[in-house]
């Protein structure tokens, strides 16, 4: 470990400059989810459970956005290592065309059949009626978010990690203000409840896109080649399909798996309380993982650039070892802090703030302890899958390692314990986390094999 961590100050300074803005961007984004949950929770547990259930299909949209963003980032980071700017414009063009088409199809489905889709998420029909107005609106916000996220990924991949932090900081302030006005009907605005939360999100996403469009047309770092952007060519489409579409499929099925976990909770005998607790703890858990997500994204940029520059396999292995150990140590520190805060802050202050009492508070504590204890495992998985393997062009294995433990272990085990055996919530919570224990050793084996290193910018015969 100590040998792997022995790097000069410039290395860690560069890692911090990449990680810091990305972590802050994620903190801002996840804080928005927490603020949304806090505001909706003031309407009652039923409203919060309804929005949690409505966000199950929405999470699929988020996963597709992240998949397109991550997939195009693989190509852009390696093209950036070669300083091939026209190919960056082509990659953005392909990603934008395919991404918007996918997001629009799902948004239309949510708009046309909201109640029917909500009925699949929970066995409580009154939650479907509460959540349907939210679902009709929220899907269209991710059409604009798709375009913004692709441009943020491009800026991040050319080492301008602060752009996304500034953009999402602006949109979070706007979204929070609009939430307050539209959910509660302040300053002369109508009181729209959960529908107001969706409209506020849509307006903030439109503002994000407008800022990205303005910056894209003026950027000197990656000046857009409009001809390459709108006519990217079949070769770029082929490369995107080869290397980015598996990432998109990966994120889609990973998102579907997470959504099914929520559906399982939504069909328990204590579904309203479990959904409310899960809504709060899901957001809090993500807040503690923001640094790990930042390190994972920074790892992807550094690995992708190093491959594009033509560094040797030994150099790439040394780099991957260093980044892995940094992530594990950071994850362990975060786990200790988070677990200490459960009795000191969450139980006496945070849970009552979100109207979680009695059974809901007990379930939230259960989810907190199991989720926080697994942070080091999540941290390494994020760095290995979304950072090292994915940036190395090892798309098949990064997908298999992330999906197999989830679909073959976590989902069936959680369903068995929650729906068939009606097991204690502690066992259900541990089953939700089971995939992490399996994923980590397999990721380590794959990275040590060195077979994950691929230069995806080279023609087929030269790799």
Task: Spell out what each predicted region is.
Residues 48-108, 145-164, 275-342, 379-398:
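Small-residue-rich hydrophobic transmembrane alpha-helices
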Residues 24, 36-40, 51, 76, ...:
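Hydrophobic/aromatic residues within transmembrane alpha-helices of membrane transport systems
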Residues 69, 138-156, 164-172, 197-212, ...:
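Short runs within selected transmembrane alpha-helices of multi-pass transporters and secretion channels
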Residues 60-63, 175-179, 209-213, 286-290, ...:
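Hydrophobic transmembrane alpha-helices of multi-pass small-molecule transporters
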Residues 1-22, 76-141, 189-244, 303-374, ...:
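Short alpha-helical transmembrane segments in multi-pass integral membrane proteins
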Residues 17-36, 137, 148, 171, ...:
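Transmembrane helical elements of multi-pass membrane transporters/channels
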Residues 7-38, 42-43, 59-71, 75, ...:
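N-terminal transmembrane alpha-helices
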Residues 27-49, 118-125, 181-192, 252-283, ...:
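Helix-terminus/linker motif at the lipid-water interface of multi-pass membrane proteins
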């Amino acid at each position: 470990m100590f040998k792997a961590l022995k790097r000069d100050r410039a290395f860690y300074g560069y890692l911090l400059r990449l990680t810091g803005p990305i972590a802050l961007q994620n903190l801002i984004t996840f804080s928005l989810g927490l603020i949304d949950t806090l505001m909706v929770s003031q309407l009652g547990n039923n409203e919060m459970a309804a929005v949690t259930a409505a966000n199950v299909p929405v999470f699929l949209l988020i996963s597709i956005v992240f998949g397109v963003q991550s997939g195009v980032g693989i190509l852009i980071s390696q093209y950036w290592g070669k300083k091939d700017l026209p190919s960056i414009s082509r990659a953005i063009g392909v990603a934008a065309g395919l991404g918007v088409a996918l997001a629009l199809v799902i948004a239309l489905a949510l708009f046309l059949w909201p109640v029917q889709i909500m009925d699949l998420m929970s066995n409580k029909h009154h939650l479907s009626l509460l959540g349907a107005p939210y679902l009709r609106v929220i899907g269209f916000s991710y059409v604009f978010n798709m375009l913004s996220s692709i441009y943020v990924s491009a800026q991040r991949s050319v080492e301008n990690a602060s752009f996304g932090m500034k953009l999402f900081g602006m949109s979070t302030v706007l979204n929070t203000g609009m939430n307050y006005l539209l959910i509660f009907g302040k300053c002369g605005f109508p009181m729209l409840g959960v529908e107001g939360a969706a409209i506020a999100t849509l307006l903030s996403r439109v503002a994000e896109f407008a800022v990205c469009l303005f910056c894209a047309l003026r950027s000197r770092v990656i000046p857009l080649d409009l001809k390459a952007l709108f006519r990217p060519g079949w070769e770029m489409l082929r490369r995107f399909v080869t290397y980015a579409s598996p990432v998109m499929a990966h994120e889609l099925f990973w998102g579907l798996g997470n959504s099914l976990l929520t559906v399982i909770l939504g069909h328990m005998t204590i579904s309203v309380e479990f959904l409310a607790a899960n809504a709060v703890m899901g957001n809090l858990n993500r807040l503690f993982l923001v640094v790990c997500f930042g390190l994972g994204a920074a790892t992807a940029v550094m690995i992708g650039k190093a491959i594009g520059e033509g560094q040797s396999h030994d150099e790439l292995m040394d780099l991957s070892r260093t980044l892995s150990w940094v992530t594990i140590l950071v994850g362990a520190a975060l786990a200790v802090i988070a677990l200490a805060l459960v009795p000191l802050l969450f139980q006496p202050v945070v849970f009552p703030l979100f109207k979680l009492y009695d059974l809901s508070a007990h379930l939230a504590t259960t989810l907190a302890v199991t989720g926080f204890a697994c942070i080091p495992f999540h941290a390494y998985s994020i760095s290995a899958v979304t950072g090292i393997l994915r940036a190395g062009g090892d798309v098949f294995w990064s997908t298999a390692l992330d999906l197999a433990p989830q679909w073959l272990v976590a989902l069936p085990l959680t369903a068995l314990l929650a729906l068939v055996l009606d097991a204690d919530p502690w066992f259900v919570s541990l089953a939700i986390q089971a995939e992490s224990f399996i994923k980590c050793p397999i990721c380590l084996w794959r990275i040590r094999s060195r077979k994950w290193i691929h230069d995806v910018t080279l023609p087929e015969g030269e790799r």
